[in-house]
Amino acid sequence: MENNRVNHFLFELVSPEKPVFSEQVVSVVLPSASGALTVMANHAPLVASIVLGSMYVLTSSGEKLFAVCGGVANITSSGCSVLVERVVVVQHLSFHDLEQRILRVRATLEGDSNDGISHKIEDFFHQLKVGDAGLTEA
């Protein structure tokens, strides 16, 4: 008899202000310092640095998308906890809110001589544009 049961694990996403998401999930794709990192049930233990980017969470009921900025992930065989400096639930972000956030960040970057940070933020904007199908119009 074939086992078609999907293995789930506990995923927790926490910001400095509050817990953002805690649920049994199928998989999570994290933006780590070494590239995209896919976490599934029974993953080998790992601690990873989280960078500016998009975090995809696959649940039994669908996909959730978060925009995150900096943090750390603690991955065990039974779960994954991610503490991030900043997080936005992309499904709850209106187009107007996104435009305003982009304008504020771009204004802050004007005159910034740190090319590394500028490139990371440009990459992040590109990722948000690619993932804008999940954004909700206000």
From Swiss-Prot:
One function term, GO molecular function aspect: ATP binding
Alphabetically ordered keywords of this record: ATP synthesis, Cell inner membrane, Cell membrane, CF(1), Hydrogen ion transport, Ion transport, Membrane, Transport
GO cellular component: plasma membrane; proton-transporting ATP synthase complex
Keyword Cell membrane listed: yes
Main localization (coarse): membrane
Protein's UniProt keywords contain Kinase: no
InterPro entries: ATP_synth_F1_dsu/esu (IPR001469), ATP_synth_F1_dsu/esu_N (IPR020546), ATPsynth_dsu/esu_N (IPR036771)
Location within or outside the cell: Cell inner membrane
Domain of life: Bacteria
Membrane association type: Peripheral membrane protein
HAMAP family with a match to the protein in the record: ATP_synth_epsil_bac
Subunit record text: F-type ATPases have 2 components, CF(1) - the catalytic core - and CF(0) - the membrane proton channel. CF(1) has five subunits: alpha(3), beta(3), gamma(1), delta(1), epsilon(1). CF(0) has three main subunits: a, b and c.
Family listed: Belongs to the ATPase epsilon chain family.
Function according to Swiss-Prot or TrEMBL: Produces ATP from ADP in the presence of a proton gradient across the membrane.
Name the record gives this protein: ATP synthase epsilon chain
Species this protein is from: Bartonella henselae (strain ATCC 49882 / DSM 28221 / CCUG 30454 / Houston 1)
Gene name as annotated: atpC
